[in-house]
Amino acid sequence: MAVSVLAAATAVAQTPSSKEFNERYQLLVSKLGPSGVGIETLLDKWEAAYPDDADMLLGKFTYYFSKSQSSAVVAKPQEKFLGEKPVLTLKDTLGNPVNYFQVTEYDDELFGMSQKSIEKAIQLNPDRLDLRFLKVAALTGYEKESPDMALSNLKSLIIYNETQHPKWVYPGYEKVDEELFSAAIQEYCFLFFKYATPVSYEAFKEISETMLSYHPSDVLYLDNVGSYWLVVKHDYKQAAKYYNKVLKIKQDDITAIKNMILLARNTSNTKLEKKYLPLLVKYSDSESERLSAKARLEALSIKK
């Protein structure tokens, strides 16, 4: 019995603390990258000793997510893919341009393993906002032009935030307020708009409308929906409705002002353009933009 107790005590003494595991992990990652040789072995040992450790689960997520990725060059007919220009353009036998884009591809099994790790981390640490956004970021990269799961997760996150009012924790930030949360959501709106695919545009609109369902006077998301109608649907009447609503709330909103000028030009509505150009002159922070708006106003005045 004495030998068994001594052996157990020795084993406990030899098991590194969670902090020590994390220090070893960070050192390896700094030298070898997130999926370097030996990192999986260390993570497995860490998991065996501390199966619910948040840093360990984050490490496993990072390892499998990194491991799942590979770079490829694919041919696409469009001039841009996911908002990026081609890395190479050649011509086919008929002389038509063929664009080649560099993309990240994913191994489904390894990606699935990364998701299991981050989901367990979220389950054990429901108020860690960084973990939730890491999951969405991974899904966004994985799904590319069709971000259905990313959209679903973002909508659920918004609803959870607005109905449960969690006390979010985000490493590196002393306090997580509504402004930070909204700014993080807007980053995904920007990304989906940049992707410029039918599915990503709809995701952009749906996220914006979900935010507006809780904050109907939020000019950031009103501008978003206006841009959807302007750029995606070319429904200028609907777009103007949203931009005018923004300007009633915030008369110096540059996004709404500039897009109303663009809308006026697209519809050859000189009267409307002359209405909004002075606002650009008044509120723009850019000297060149103000000068350009003044010159345009003068040119329109000469034409009448």
Go through the PLM ranges and name each one.
Residues L58-G59, D130-A137, P166-G172, Q186-E187, ...:
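Alpha-solenoid helical repeat scaffolds
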